[in-house]
C-alpha cells in the first residue's frame, strides 16, 4: 500500500469522523421527541451545532423516526448550505441556520408541533405565567411572535421565520439566553439551549406549561398571573447566584 493511499484514507477517515460527535448527539436528541410525546409521524426536528467547525447537524427531511440513524443526520453550515450528507436536511433548516448565526450562545434547537404549545401558537397568544412550574424555567410569559406577513411568506419562508423570531425578541426586549422558547403565531414552537439535550428539555417543559395554562383557564378563566415574589423565588432558587436546587 502506497503512502499516498494511506494519506488519502486517513484524510477520508478524519473527514468522516470529525462530525460524528454532533451526528450522534443530534440523533439521540431527535429520538427523544417521540418518546416524550412531542411529535407525530415525521413532525419536528432537532439540530446540534459545533461552533468551532462552524456547522450543525440536523434531522433529514421527512424520514420517519424509526428509520433514523446517526449516519443519516445532515451536516449544514450557518448559511444553510449542506456540507455533508446523502439526504436533504429538514425543511426548517434555514430557520435553524438563522438562529445559530445570530444567537452565538446556543448550540441546540428544537422545532415541534406539540399539541398544546401549537394550540397557543395558532391562537396567537403568549402563554401567561400562571404557576411555579412556569416560573422554575423563565420569569416571563412564553412569547408568541406575530404571524408572518405575506411578503415574508412568499419570500424565503423558512429563512424569514428565523428573523421573525429574532425581531420579536429584539422588539420585546427579551434575552434569548434567558427565554429559551418561543411560539410563532399561526405556526408552532421553537426552543433552544446550550446543547441539543437542553433544547429538547425546554421543548418538553414548554408543552407541559402550555397544557397547564390551558387547563388553568378552563377551570378559572379569570385566573391571576403568578405574583412577582413567587416568580422571583422559584426562578432564583434554580438559576440565581445563590441557587440551592439540586445536588451541585
Question: Whereabouts are the PLM-identified features?
Answer:
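N-terminal amphipathic/basic-hydrophobic helices that include classical n-h-c signal peptides
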Residues: 1-15
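Glycine-rich flexible loops
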Residues: 16-248
Amino acid at each position: 500500500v502506497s503512502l499516498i493511499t494511506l494519506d488519502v484514507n486517513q484524510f477520508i477517515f478524519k473527514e468522516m469522523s470529525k462530525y460524528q460527535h454532533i451526528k450522534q448527539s443530534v440523533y439521540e436528541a431527535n429520538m427523544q421527541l417521540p418518546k416524550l410525546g412531542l411529535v407525530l409521524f415525521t413532525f419536528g426536528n432537532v439540530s446540534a451545532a459545533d461552533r468551532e467547525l462552524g456547522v450543525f447537524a440536523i434531522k433529514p427531511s421527512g424520514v420517519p423516526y424509526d428509520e433514523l440513524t446517526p449516519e443519516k443526520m445532515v451536516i449544514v453550515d450557518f448559511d444553510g448550505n449542506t456540507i455533508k450528507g446523502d439526504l436533504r436536511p429538514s425543511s426548517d433548516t434555514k430557520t435553524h441556520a438563522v438562529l445559530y448565526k445570530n444567537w452565538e450562545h446556543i448550540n441546540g434547537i428544537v422545532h415541534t408541533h406539540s399539541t398544546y404549545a401549537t394550540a397557543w401558537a395558532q391562537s396567537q397568544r403568549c402563554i401567561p405565567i400562571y404557576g411555579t412550574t412556569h416560573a422554575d424555567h423563565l420569569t416571563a410569559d412564553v412569547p408568541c411572535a406575530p404571524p408572518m406577513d405575506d411578503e415574508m411568506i412568499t419570500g424565503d419562508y423558512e429563512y424569514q421565520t428565523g428573523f421573525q423570531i429574532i425581531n420579536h425578541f429584539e422588539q420585546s426586549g427579551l434575552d434569548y439566553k434567558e427565554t429559551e422558547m418561543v411560539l410563532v403565531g399561526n405556526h408552532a414552537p421553537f426552543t433552544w439551549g446550550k446543547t441539543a439535550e437542553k433544547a429538547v428539555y425546554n421543548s418538553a417543559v414548554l408543552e407541559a406549561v402550555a397544557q397547564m395554562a390551558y387547563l388553568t383557564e378552563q377551570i378559572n378563566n379569570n385566573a391571576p398571573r403568578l405574583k412577582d415574589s413567587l416568580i422571583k423565588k422559584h426562578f432564583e432558587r434554580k438559576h440565581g447566584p445563590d441557587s440551592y436546587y439540586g445536588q451541585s
